[in-house]
Amino acid sequence: WQRNPYKGQNFDLQTDIPYLFNSNVGMNMKVNIFRQDSTFANVKALPAFYYHINNRQKIGLRGTFENSTILDSLYVQGKDYNKKGIGVYFDMTEPSDIDLFLYKTKINFGYDYLTTTYTKENIKSPQNQFYFFGEYNYHINGNHFLNIKAEGAMLDSKVNFTANELYRFGGWNSLRGFNENSLSADFYYYGSLEYRYLIG
């Protein structure tokens, strides 16, 4: 659960079962609820099944079920919508020998084909969604490390997006110097280079 300075509240819940019935098939379920003060609320569920290529790599198939409701009738930048779709993704994680690092290398990218229905206008629109994340902790020598990170995402549609369906980013885990989830766009990318010195 996270609250940002702009009265936005974000709740994430995730469960993962890596080896169903002792097979190489796993299951993942994510639920996200985002509420922006009293203007709108988004609820998203992402059920997924994936296959372990090896102990570091997996490919998966996921569904997207999203519902957004405008809570304030004076909020004209957003619209009520339902979103459904299917997507594929790839994930690679290389573990780290350093306990403070979650991993040495992580690469995740995916594509989703979505159908969005704007309920009050009775408009249906196909959408394409692309996502990429990559991070690498490079050991220079001794206690000196370099963290290299890149992330990007894009929504593509023939219909203009509403404010309540845009990506929200910014903050400690993405663009530092901005408040959490204070930026929104249908396309973003960024890269960062960070020097780290481990004490001890």
Language-model regions, residue ranges each:
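Gram-negative/organellar outer-membrane beta-barrel architecture
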Residues: 1-108, 168-171, 182-185
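C-terminal outer-membrane beta-barrel translocator/porin domains of Gram-negative envelope proteins
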Residues: 86-200
